[in-house]
């Protein structure tokens, strides 16, 4: 398993200007460097766009893709849409109170997810505002969601039933854009099905990857 800090994320380089196609190019460069000539890809939320783009631009490298809570809505990030939905009510609240309110709308079980997230390193703390904004800007680019309708590789889409960062409706809209995709809703999940229903996610995704792996 290769877990990648994409350009602008984590401990990777953080240029002030990023183009959407840079992500797939970086992934291909890394795979070549470590002698991986084919792989299955899992992309979460906006990362689903990158997995889709990788499959379209480098089909020979991709045996299948798994998209978790994908969305085809452009121009605004999921977290921004969630805040805007309730801004009339919470915009003047203190930050802690805002977060508690939004957590109840992000997660199926907010306490469980916050416990998990405490163990996730916040690499944004080592990024400047300009570097963080560069990543946000690339995912708000017009036209990037067009990539979904060009996907040809086997595709599994997983959506959490609960939470408002992204919705099952948004995920289903992506599924409708990808011919012959499989669509699964996890009934006890929200933003992170791979954590909230880890055993089911691991089993189903492993089976899907093996089913479409090169013989």
Show where each model-derived region lies.
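Alpha/beta-hydrolase active-site loop signature
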Residues: 6-10, 72, 190-193
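Conserved catalytic-core motifs of eukaryotic protein kinase domains, centered on the activation segment
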Residues: 12-17, 76-79, 168-169
């Amino acid at each position: 398993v290769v877990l990648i800090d994409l350009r602008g994320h984590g401990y990777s380089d953080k240029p002030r200007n990023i183009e959407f196609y840079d992500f797939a190019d970086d992934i291909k460069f890394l795979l070549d460097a470590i002698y991986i000539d084919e792989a299955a890809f899992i992309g979460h939320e906006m990362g689903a766009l990158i997995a889709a783009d990788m499959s379209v631009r480098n089909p020979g490298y991709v045996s299948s893709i798994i998209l978790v809570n994908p969305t085809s809505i452009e121009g605004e990030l999921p977290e921004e849409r969630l805040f805007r939905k309730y801004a009339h009510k919470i915009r003047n609240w203190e930050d802690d109170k805002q977060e508690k309110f939004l957590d109840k709308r992000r997660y199926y079980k907010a306490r469980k997810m916050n416990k998990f997230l405490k163990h996730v390193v916040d690499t944004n703390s080592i990024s400047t505002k300009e570097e963080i904004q560069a990543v946000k800007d690339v995912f708000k680019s017009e036209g990037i969601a067009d990539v979904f309708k060009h996907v040809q590789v086997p595709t599994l889409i997983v959506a959490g039933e609960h939470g408002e960062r992204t919705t099952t409706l948004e995920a289903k809209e992506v599924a409708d854009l990808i011919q012959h995709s499989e669509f699964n809703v996890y009934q006890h999940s929200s933003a992170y099905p791979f954590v909230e229903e880890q055993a089911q996610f691991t089993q189903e995704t492993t089976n899907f990857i093996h089913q479409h792996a090169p013989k």
